[in-house]
């Protein structure tokens, strides 16, 4: 039934570590030997695999990216137009400015925007800016925030620290040991733990997801807002998964969080690679003081 997919996956696994670039799309995480690894085409909620089997995607819709459906004709019309005009030149594209203006209308707390490609690199950038602004090192986090060193550093202290978000007992190989104790995990909605951890010194930022199966509760949110304001800790809201799914912009508005920076990804591009940091000028301006630059941004 899925012969062509299985054959290609076996070949790919020999020349690509893990078979592909994204852990969440590997067949063994769903149904080993029974999950179609590849798609041939897609439209709306439907996917066709290499053996021409047709499926309704009741899973993650592109790992949370395609809230407007696959292969959206309205979006494709504008993308194709831009491709025909030219995509990347020595000069800047005007769309960067116009999209920034539109996002600032939605996130009224913010003054400035910085774009990136994937959610993980956008989170890494947000953490860099927080550390740059505060001249402090520690990051308290609650949620899944990518694969970069700042995040995996949590497992330098205890290999189980990221068990709720990544592979069990993941050894952070390749992450400099000097980063030990720089990333402090915080259990989702655990107010007592937040009160205890926030007493530490040298905290640059607290990073949270506003929802993960459920919302942060009111007492947690109120204390988080209060302690960040009191201790001048940068509050970063990771809306990469939650953003644009329930409301225009981020869930943080619905539950009363007062962010300094909000990070969007996934659904922002409906399958096209784009992410954004939306934040207050006092934080975003530090991008001029620390080097952040990419030809693909």
Question: Where in this protein do the model-derived segments appear?
Answer:
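Conserved N-terminal phosphate-binding loop of PLP-dependent enzymes in the Aspartate aminotransferase
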Residues: 1-297
């Amino acid at each position: 039934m899925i012969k062509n997919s299985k054959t290609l996956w076996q070949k790919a696994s020999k020349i690509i570590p893990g078979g592909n670039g994204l852990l969440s799309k590997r067949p063994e995480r769903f149904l080993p030997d029974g999950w179609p690894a590849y798609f041939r085409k897609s439209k709306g909620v439907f996917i066709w695999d290499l053996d021409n089997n047709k499926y309704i995607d009741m899973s993650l819709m592109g790992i949370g990216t395609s809230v407007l459906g696959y292969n959206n004709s309205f979006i494709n019309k504008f993308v194709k137009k831009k491709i025909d005009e030219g995509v990347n030149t020595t000069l800047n594209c005007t769309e960067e400015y116009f999209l920034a203006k539109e996002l600032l209308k939605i996130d009224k707390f913010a003054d400035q925007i910085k774009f990136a490609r994937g959610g993980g690199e956008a989170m890494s950038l947000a953490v860099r800016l927080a550390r740059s602004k505060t001249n402090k090192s520690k990051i308290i986090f609650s949620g899944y925030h990518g694969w970069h060193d700042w995040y995996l550093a949590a497992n330098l202290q205890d290999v189980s620290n990221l068990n709720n978000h990544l592979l069990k007992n993941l050894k952070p190989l390749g992450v400099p040991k000097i980063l030990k104790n720089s990333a402090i995990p915080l259990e989702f909605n655990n107010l007592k733990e937040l009160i205890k951890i926030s007493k530490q010194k040298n905290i640059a930022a607290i990073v949270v997801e506003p929802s993960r199966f459920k919302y942060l509760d009111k007492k947690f949110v109120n204390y988080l807002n209060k302690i960040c304001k009191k201790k001048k800790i940068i509050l970063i809201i990771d809306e990469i998964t939650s953003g644009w799914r329930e409301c225009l912009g981020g869930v943080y508005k619905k539950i009363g969080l007062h962010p300094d920076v909000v990070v969007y990804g996934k659904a922002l591009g409906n399958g096209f690679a784009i992410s954004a940091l939306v934040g207050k000028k006092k934080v975003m301006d530090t991008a001029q003081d620390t080097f952040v630059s990419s030809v693909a941004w």
